Amino acid sequence: MGNTFDAAVVNRVVEGLAQSHQKLLLDLEALTDEMVRLPSLLEGWTVGHVLAHITQQGDSIRRIFLAAEQGQIIDQYEGGMSERVAAIEGAALRSAKEHVADVRRSIYDLEGAIASARQGWFGTARMVSGAIASVADLPLRRWREVEVHQGDLGLSELGCDGPESWSLNYVRHDLPGMTMQFKAHGPMGFNDLPSQVRTLGPAQRLGWLLGRVSIEGLPPAGLMG
């Protein structure tokens, strides 16, 4: 896989990610134990499950950065998907205070690994899906995870409820790329957005591409798995 390191793009993404990390921490200040046990917008997951995943996904990206700095290519999660699922289940029942503390720890651990990366930017990693990814692309993947899963919490009282809670900066950055990815899935590498999607606002349009917005009579975009 060719390296896709572009310093200017990476700088913008890392800055946006840091801002989204801080927004998440600020919004979670009012999290309660009762909220942790509520169902999230993801079927079968509580708010606690989503928070555990945000934490562990951050830890997995940190591991990749540290390994890449040593010239190593590792799996995103030790033990693969089964260990990832078990770890989320094991952490989901933590208290609100414990969740917030661990989210904060994972954020600063990851940001430290990103800040100290040198040659690691030119490495690759095996993602949990089995795909090989460039380390330089991981901050955007993490940014997407933070924004999308913050909306998946479904906590309107905290401002964490669906695509409309995603930051404008994130939507502006990721929408063009995800739109291009959708178009590339069509015959001859061209597949235009359906008319029902083109009439949506930017956040809702990106939400459809990422499987977070449903449109009656229209199948999912199919980009996320």
State what each model feature region is.
Residues 19, 42-45, 49-56, 141-144:
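Aromatic- and histidine-enriched alpha-helix N-cap/loop-to-helix transition segments
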Residues 21-25, 29, 58-62, 104-115, ...:
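Structural signal for well-ordered, non-membrane alpha-helices
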Residues 1-13, 66-76, 116-225:
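Structured surface interface patches that mediate subunit assembly and partner/cofactor docking
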Residues 51-80:
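Conserved alpha-helical segments that form or flank metal/cofactor-binding pockets of metalloenzymes
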